[in-house]
Amino acid sequence: MAGHSKWKNIQRRKNAQDAKRGKLFMKLAKEIYVAAKMGGGDPTTNATLRLAIEKAKSANMPNENIERAIKKATGNQEHTHYEEIRYEGYGPGGVAVMVICLTDNKNRTASNVRVAFSKNGGNLGETGCVSYLFDRKGLIVIARENLHIDEDDMLLQAIEAGADEMETTEDSFEIYTSPEQFEQVKNTLAAQGFTFATAEITMIPQTYTTLTGDDLTKMLKLIDMLEDDDDVQEIYHNLDESMLE
């Protein structure tokens, strides 16, 4: 992971989301709805819902939107059934791609994802064809701007909180945890006064791929096309983050 800052990828994703805020809120509301429907509407006892709410708040989603999604999921009205589906494949130049969807129509979603890959030099594969190239980890990113702590002290606090490792970039401290320790580390650091640019359980590539020219152009178009799909919740890939600048 060394040298591959997640900060650029996060910034790009947030900038793209800012430009499509209505679509983003719809996707976040769907995630909250599914979490509340599956595990109940109380975030203190539903960890999946708690993480979905925190994710929505970090995107500045209004509280009334969050509450509406929970109420819809826990009310007596007819429910929409969403199914989580994971698609795996390769983008141009052999970039590994995983696409996580929440859909009420598997045929529509499969068709849209397949078209996005085929139009941009990629190929969908079987389940498991690229997931082994990623590790599921907690990621906590703390921006270094206006932060008065050096790398050694930050590393010590992160490790004492239960983190596995930390990377330092020019812009940020990037703290990695096991999925099981994620909430403990996040809550401990928050109690110490740290605020987070992002805090999520995500998929971290084991290795990275660099692209140039037409392959890079097509890969960026593939990411954009998938992000525009209402059914797509998350896109994980191992394109080198420097390619996203």
Curated annotation (Swiss-Prot):
Domain of life according to the entry: Bacteria
Ranges annotated as biased composition (Basic residues): 1-14
Main location as per UniProt: cytoplasm
GO MF annotation terms: DNA binding
Pfam families: TACO1_YebC_N, Transcrip_reg
Entry similarity comment: Belongs to the TACO1 family.
PANTHER family assigned to the protein according to its UniProt record, in alphabetical order: TRANSCRIPTIONAL REGULATORY PROTEIN YEBC-RELATED, TRANSLATIONAL ACTIVATOR OF CYTOCHROME C OXIDASE 1
NCBIfam families to which the protein is assigned, alphabetical: PRK00110.1, PRK12378.1, YebC/PmpR family DNA-binding transcriptional regulator
Protein name: Probable transcriptional regulatory protein Aflv_0709
